[in-house]
Design a protein with these regions (language model features):
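Cell-envelope and extracellular/periplasmic
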Residues: 19-273
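Bacterial Sec-dependent N-terminal signal peptides
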Residues: 1-20
């Protein structure tokens, strides 16, 4: 598993002499949308962080609630990990950061796990989301004249529940996630990096399906090039008191995710220099 570890003293500004833009995609289901508290993410407001809005083809300051109800995607209710992520990344690199939010609560990776019109990232389903994501991403690339720097993926809870319900196998989930990564790379470029926030647990529900999803995510990070687990602490959130409810992360958790994935992503980029 390509799991990275952060040591504070290792990080320096990568591009101190010039201003650069970085475009990141926030994709997945409800914990990617964000179900936290915007009052607890306000401290991450920055003049160098932005969100792309497809409606109106515009950039806006990145503040919670991040996201917009467009192209079947949703906005945070009311806090997310993205202000903390973008702020930390910008501080450590000096770059301007643009977030493209492409997440929908309850969406599945495999269409066998899809619930009604909650959406799926699979090739077929009641509400396929992939094409909408690509439309939004390409519009953002054109607007900012910047290619995607990476896709940050927070998803798996819906598929874990389907595995628990014996509607889906772990092997089928793995195929669907691998296929999704390859579809993104075909649409956006073969070198697009895929960063996984490892799925946590559903309190008071069986863990078997969630363990299966977590193991698949680890396996894919070992087997596929430029796929990384950039956060693996979600399994301890219940013990830390970092759950908003049985399935969603609270704002302290989201802030922690945001800061640490910024550090980990920078570390992957430094290794490529």
């Amino acid at each position: 598993m390509k799991l990275l570890f952060y040591f504070p003293f290792l990080f320096v500004l990568l591009h101190a002499s010039a201003q650069h833009k970085k475009l990141f995609i926030a994709a997945g289901q409800s914990n990617a949308v964000g179900m936290g508290d915007s009052a607890l993410s306000k401290m991450y407001a920055s003049a160098k962080t932005f969100e792309y809005r497809f409606t109106g083809d515009s950039l806006k300051a990145l503040t919670d609630p991040v996201g917009y109800s467009e192209l079947h995607f949703e906005k945070a209710n009311t806090g997310s990990e993205w202000p903390a992520f973008a702020s930390e990344y910008s501080i450590l690199t000096g770059n301007e950061i643009i977030i493209v939010q492409a997440a929908r609560g309850g969406s599945s990776c495999n269409n066998k796990a899809e619930l009604n019109n909650y959406g799926t990232w699979d090739e077929k389903g009641n509400l396929p989301l992939f094409d909408s994501a690509v439309i939004k991403i390409k519009a953002a690339e054109k607007k900012t004249r910047t290619k995607v720097g990476g896709i940050i993926w927070s998803q798996g809870e819906r598929d874990a529940n389907a595995i628990n319900a014996q509607q889906l196998t772990a092997a089928a989930y793995q195929v669907s996630l691998e296929t999704l990564i390859n579809r993104f790379r075909k649409a956006l470029g073969a070198g697009v990096k895929f960063y996984i926030i490892q799925t946590g647990y559903y309190i008071h529900h069986p863990r078997e399906g969630f363990d299966a999803v977590r193991k698949v995510q680890e396996a894919i990070s070992k087997q596929m090039k430029d796929v990384y687990i950039v956060y693996n602490e979600t399994g301890s959130f219940e013990d830390r008191g970092w759950m908003k409810d049985e399935i969603h992360y609270n704002q302290p958790a989201l802030n922690d995710i945001g800061r640490k994935i910024a550090m980990q992503i920078i570390q992957t980029e430094k290794k490529k220099l």
